[in-house]
């Protein structure tokens, strides 16, 4: 009986039906739905309210991610050149030794939260590593479950324009040098994230973009499948 119930729920779920449709290699244009869980639109149908409706926006490319993040921040009235209280951000790397206030989480790649405090940006020169100044800011980040990461030292350039101030080699040198503080953490705005960052996570309401991108047919299918299955309740999908 339990298995029958699971099968019945799966058969009734438009999200599951769409994921199976995609796995079979069928185009989005041929998927039929009543709009209860899944709605599929074209680019010309996009309205601003879709961006604020979604718990998470997912796309394929960094160019699209940056475009959406800039647009959402503009609509929120946030200045483009500086972070704001309430900005949604995502960790780009694992920092297993950085533990949340309650001790429940480590700061991992893909961790998403909201800025609750940030300091004015400061500049320092790790002269043993690089002659170039590095802009940093101290930030507190609140997670969805209200746990917090406090006093995070963020790479300001990485967050605001998407370019890390240090190379991977320089970060390694800083983190392993007794002469320097640890390298600042790399974060990005997270109103939109790429599908690869979204893997393993799930949100109630997802806005997804199919996009045109230079991947083969099989990769495109895997992308759409992963995107679709990130939504647990409702999915709005924008066809390319």
Language-model regions, residue ranges each:
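C-terminal accessory regions
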Residues: 124-240
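Conserved helicase motor core of P-loop NTPases
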Residues: 1-148
């Amino acid at each position: 009986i339990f298995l029958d119930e699971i099968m019945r729920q799966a058969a009734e779920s438009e999200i599951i039906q769409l994921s199976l449709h995609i796995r079979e290699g069928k185009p989005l244009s041929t998927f039929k739905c009543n709009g209860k869980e899944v709605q599929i639109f074209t680019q010309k149908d996009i309205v601003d309210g879709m961006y604020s409706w979604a718990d998470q926006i997912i796309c394929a490319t960094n160019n699209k991610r940056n475009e959406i993040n800039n647009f959402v921040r503009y609509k929120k009235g946030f200045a483009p050149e500086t972070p704001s209280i309430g900005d949604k951000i995502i960790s780009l790397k694992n920092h297993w030794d950085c533990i949340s206030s309650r001790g429940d989480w480590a700061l991992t790649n893909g961790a998403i939260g909201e800025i609750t405090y940030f300091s004015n940006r400061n500049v320092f020169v790790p002269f043993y590593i690089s002659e170039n100044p590095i802009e940093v800011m101290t930030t507190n980040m609140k997670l969805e479950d209200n746990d917090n990461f406090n006093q995070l030292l963020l790479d300001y350039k990485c967050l605001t324009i998407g370019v890390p101030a240090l190379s991977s080699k320089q970060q390694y040198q800083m983190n392993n040098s007794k002469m320097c503080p640890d390298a600042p953490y790399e974060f990005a705005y997270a109103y939109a994230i790429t599908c690869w960052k979204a893997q393993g996570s799930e949100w109630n309401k997802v806005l997804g973009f199919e996009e045109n991108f230079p991947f083969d047919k099989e990769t495109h299918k895997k992308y759409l499948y992963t995107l679709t299955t990130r939504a647990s309740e409702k999915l709005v999908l924008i066809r390319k």
